[in-house]
Structures are given as C-alpha cells and as structure tokens.
Amino acid sequence: MIRSVIRGVGSALPKKSLSNDEIAKFVETSDSWIVQRTGIRQRYIANENETTVSLGVEAARVALINANLTIKDIDCIILATSTPNHTFPASAVEIQHALGMSHGFAFDIQAVCSGFIFALTTGDAYLRSGVAKRILVIGSETFSRILDWKDRTTCVLFGDGAGAVVLEAQEIQSDVALECGILSAKLYSNGAYVNKLYVDGGPSTTQTTGYLRMEGREVFKYAVCMITDAVDDCFAAAGINSSQLDWFVPHQANKRIIEASAKKLGISMDKVIITVDQHGNTSAASVPLALTTAICDGRIKKGDLVMLEAMGGGFTWGAILIRW
C-alpha cells in the first residue's frame, strides 16, 4: 500500500525583522506587554520586492535541494495562502512557472492559518489515490499587507514567511504505525465563527483588500478546545496513544494557546516546538516553518512520532500525525 512520506523541507523569511521595540514606536505597546501576552519577540516583514510567490519559490527550492530532487520530479504544487499575489490566477501557478515547471498542475488552498494542514492532507490523498507521485506542498504568506498597523491588538501578532515540503508516495509492506509517513489526518470547519477572525474586505463585497480583524479572547477560547479535539481524533484514527508522541508542532499563533493546548493534551512542553517568539504568527507558513526549524536543528529525527496541528479563521482546524 501507498503511504505519503515527507522527503525534504525548506523555509524562507524576508530580509527585514521587526522587533517589539520598533513596533512600540508607532503604536501604544511595549516589548514586555507583547511578550507577556503572546510570547512574540520579533517577526519578519516583506519588503516591496518580496511577495507570497517569491518567498514560496525560495522555500520550495530549499525543500527540493534537501530532498535531492529537481522540479522535473514534481507532479503537482499545492500552495496554502490567504495573501496571494493576485485575486487570480492562483499564486501556485506563478510559483510553478518561476521554478521552471511546465508539466503537471498547481493550485491554491485557502484555509487561513490551517491552510498548510489542509494542503498536506490534500496532497496525501492525491498520492494515495495515484493522482501524483511527488508533490510540493507550500505555505507562504505576507500578512503584513493586510494588517491595520494602527491596531495594536493585531499588528503585533503577525509576520511574513514561507515553508515547504516535498511529499512523496512510497510503497510500504503493511499499514503499521512503525512505517514512516502520514499515519492519520483530520480536518474540520465551522462557518458560524466567521466574524471572530476575518478580513473586512474582498473583491465581491467591498472591492477592496481590507484589514485583518480579530476577537482575540473569543479565538483563544475556541482554539484550545478545537485543537485538542482534532489532535485526539488523529491519535484515535492511528490507534496510537499520546504518550508515544515525540514532538508536537503546533500552529505558532500565540504562546499562551500553545501552552494551554499542550497542557490539556498532557504533552510536556519539552516536546513542543516553539518558533512564535522569532517568527510571530505567519498563518499558513507557521507549521512548515516550525517543522523545518526542528528538522534542521536536529530535534526531529528519523522514526520520531510527530503531530502537526493548526486552527484558523472560519473557523478551520485540523491535525496530522506523522512517523518521521
């Protein structure tokens, strides 16, 4: 049977970082206030020449190098983003062209901060059904373009960046949890919560881009329950106990949400990958950025059991369990 295996990872960040102290120069806030409430110390902000596409291309190239593959080996590109270069066409086809790929197919997925989880699950289904053999799954965002930089409740939270993985179909001998690859995935959404986290504009309504708006306390309240339920469902689907987990790679939204989720799941914080302090919330790029960081610094090793999760506007949420 076929199982989807991550063959290589990569990431990209804009050249400029923006510290809390720098933000405090133009909105009423402070480094201590931001760190205490979010855990964020800095984030990266794209310049006028850096875009969702350019960051996605950079991350994809690194992932291909780490996978020891070229773009000719890829059948499909799936890009998770809420900040495309254009309303249409999909930014994925722009990445496809920039990478020199004229075969196969490419498309975008929009599930906000859960986007990478949705994209990776879609790629997994394509591989297992034989639609493709190798897929580039990318999360790339330039949320700085949709922030109201006068709103201290949101502008301190988000940053720009990209992460990518090469997903490959591999034949395994039996469907056992010790075999590497994606073991289970669970996706959910509920549109009843649209007004809790959204952008107040769009081509079909205001005909403007709009700004990100959020009810922070409400998002926190729902996030912990939704995240932990999805993770528990993933463990159950794979027939694995949470005590067997080696690493928890959560969406890097807010350190408080991460800590509360880990506590509710009974996961020790020394098993939790945290990059929100350096990157802020990079939406769909958050999980692959954190994953790449933990692989490149040697924490995640072959054979490790790794749980990915995310929750975003909509609400959308989900989790993926992987044997590395």
Curated annotation (Swiss-Prot):
The active site is at residues 113, 251, 281. One of its GO terms (cellular component) is cytoplasm. CDD domains: KAS_III. It is an enzyme of class 2 (transferase). It catalyses: malonyl-[ACP] + acetyl-CoA + H(+) = 3-oxobutanoyl-[ACP] + CO2 + CoA. The keyword Cytoplasm applies. GO terms for biological process: fatty acid biosynthetic process; secondary metabolite biosynthetic process. It holds the Pfam family ACP_syn_III. Residues 252-256 are annotated as: ACP-binding. Homodimer. NCBIfam families: fabH (TIGR00747), PRK09352.1 (NF006829). The last Arg residue of the ACP-binding site is essential for the weak association between ACP/AcpP and FabH. Belongs to the thiolase-like superfamily. FabH family. Catalyzes the condensation reaction of fatty acid synthesis by the addition to an acyl acceptor of two carbons from malonyl-ACP. Catalyzes the first condensation reaction which initiates fatty acid synthesis and may therefore play a role in governing the total rate of fatty acid production. Possesses both acetoacetyl-ACP synthase and acetyl transacylase activities. Its substrate specificity determines the biosynthesis of branched-chain and/or straight-chain of fatty acids. This is Beta-ketoacyl-[acyl-carrier-protein] synthase III. The gene is fabH.
